[in-house]
Amino acid sequence: MSKQQAPVNKNDVVEVTIEDLTHDGAGVAKVDGYALFIPKALPGERLKAKVVKVKKGYGFGRVLNMIEASPDRVEAPCPVFNQCGGCQLQHMSYDAQLRYKQKQVQDVLERIGKITAVTVRPTIGMNEPWRYRNKAQVPVGEREGGLIAGFYQERSHRIIDMDECMIQHEENDKVIRQVKELARELGIRGYDEEKHRGTLRHVVARYGKNTGEIMVVLITRGEELPHKKTLIERIHKAIPHVKSIVQNVNPKRTNVIFGDKTKVLWGEEYIYDTIGDIKFAISARSFYQVNPEQTKVLYDQALEFANLTGSETVIDAYCGIGTISLFLAQQAKHVYGVEIVPEAISDAKRNARLNGFANVQFAVGDAEKVMPWWYAQGVRADVIVVDPPRKGCDEALLKTILNMKPDRVVYVSCNPATLARDLRVLEDGGYETKDVQPVDMFPWTTHIESVAVLELKN
């Protein structure tokens, strides 16, 4: 179908019924079989939409007026929901979000993975799905001569200046407000991305939800931080719980937030938090799950699926700072963790020592290279756990798992599409998907975490 053949043109107004939702939360309507994607519309709704873009085979629209609203529609409580790109689903009731996430996982398992024998469990949600994030990464800029800090507008690098975010912990909001106020007062310039000038690029606040400890990270374009001494004193005075104030220097013209150089300006290099009974040291650049309450739910589910009795050897691929490894070590005979990022492995070893685990061993490298080496050394894994990034497992890693033939594979996923793709590879290699459990780690967003378990067929 060419653009000329599309049954709609740009700026047309059409009356449609929303049939479904996409993976990024947009409503799907059909006009003579032509798909129209309409953000912030819900299944079952009848509405008038303006066509804003026409492409080959599909187009985009925006809601003009609602004719019949869904019973799942709610008033978004956040005043900047329609501008900010942080949340996508505040117009949808929380129960409906949980059903949507379960359906998304079920649909992609069937469509991409051709896995039809498994019924995905209902999504495990939060009792209090607000204020859950323990980390805020806030871009800083300038507008009309004044410093601003907030979050990016959806699909742009335009900063929405804000003092509060309803999914951030209140302590993080307080840090951002105080630093923004102090920087304005002291005349510290925000970063101009286009011209690559100004001082303060980002403010990062990290909060240990179970310890109350706070870290403030100031990411600057250069080494120089004007009024550094005064700024540190004032931050410490304004935020009594602060345990660490850190500067990270990022001189590059890049979208990457952190630079290579990090130095402690005041206090400790680490703050601490706990998930369950396990304590974790968190540095400025450590990867640590942003919703510790649901992380425990996710890891407890992974443990249940691993079905450990105390006699098993477990490999944790993509182990990060050792969060899942240490959970597994509570019930396994021995755990081997592998991760490509050297700093993460340093943190993992530190966390193992911190908690007194002697049955964990960590290695730096590509899992698909390290695991065959372990196998050659006589390591036989009963269970392999994978927790890959959004792109899913490396093809070579999946081959390695199939060669090692563990009894069970536990797959922790942050992307249902790559989960489905990888489960298909494992099923074709002799495994059977037994169970899939979505966990809502990021309420009010379209992000979906889930954990699946596969067992080796006879």
Curated annotation (Swiss-Prot):
Keyword Disulfide bond among record annotations: no
GO molecular function terms listed in the Swiss-Prot or TrEMBL record: 4 iron, 4 sulfur cluster binding; metal ion binding; rRNA (uridine-C5-)-methyltransferase activity
Enzyme Commission number(s) of this protein: 2.1.1.-
Binding positions for S-adenosyl-L-methionine per the UniProt entry: 289, 318, 339, 387
Keywords annotated in UniProt: 4Fe-4S, Iron, Iron-sulfur, Metal-binding, Methyltransferase, S-adenosyl-L-methionine, Transferase
Residue ranges occupied by any TRAM domain in the UniProt entry: 5-65
Top-level taxon in the UniProt lineage: Bacteria
Gene Ontology process terms (BP): rRNA base methylation
Active site feature: 414
Binding-site residues, [4Fe-4S] cluster: 78, 84, 87, 165
PROSITE patterns hit by this protein: SAM_MT_RNA_M5U, TRAM, TRMA_1, TRMA_2
Enzyme class: transferase
Family in the record: Belongs to the class I-like SAM-binding methyltransferase superfamily. RNA M5U methyltransferase family.
UniProt protein name: Uncharacterized RNA methyltransferase BH0687
Protein's organism: Halalkalibacterium halodurans (strain ATCC BAA-125 / DSM 18197 / FERM 7344 / JCM 9153 / C-125) (Bacillus halodurans)
Lineage start: Bacteria, Bacillati, Bacillota, Bacilli, Bacillales
